[in-house]
Amino acid sequence: MEIKHPATAGTLESSDIQITLSPATSGVAIQLQSSVEKQFGHQIRSVIEATLAKLGIENVAVDANDKGALDCTIKARTIAAVYRASDNKTFDWEEINAWIN
């Protein structure tokens, strides 16, 4: 998949994360805002990077605003943002379920 235009998934509610993706030309750049960044920033970035890699996304700018989201929520929001930003309307749920657990 390829990021074609900016897209957002998630909210700024407690226990959620808002992920905004934009096209980029050189790699994955993650801008993270989180009240728990010192404790969990590395883990949040790792989950986002791993999810993007599973989806084949190599060039993207990520703006993540975390409000205490669990890993499963971070994965779900990242997947939703990628599908929106790539205009992909075909979901292979069996494949996604196989690697998100």
Swiss-Prot record:
Pfam families: ACP. GO terms for cellular component: cytoplasm. It comes from the Bacteria. The modification O-(phosphoribosyl dephospho-coenzyme A)serine is found at residue 14. Coiled coil: none annotated. Keywords: Cytoplasm, Phosphoprotein. InterPro entries: CitD, Mal_deCO2ase/Cit_lyase_ACP. It is found in: Cytoplasm. Oligomer with a subunit composition of (alpha,beta,gamma)6. Belongs to the CitD family. Covalent carrier of the coenzyme of citrate lyase. This is Citrate lyase acyl carrier protein. It comes from Lacticaseibacillus paracasei (strain ATCC 334 / BCRC 17002 / CCUG 31169 / CIP 107868 / KCTC 3260 / NRRL B-441) (Lactobacillus paracasei).
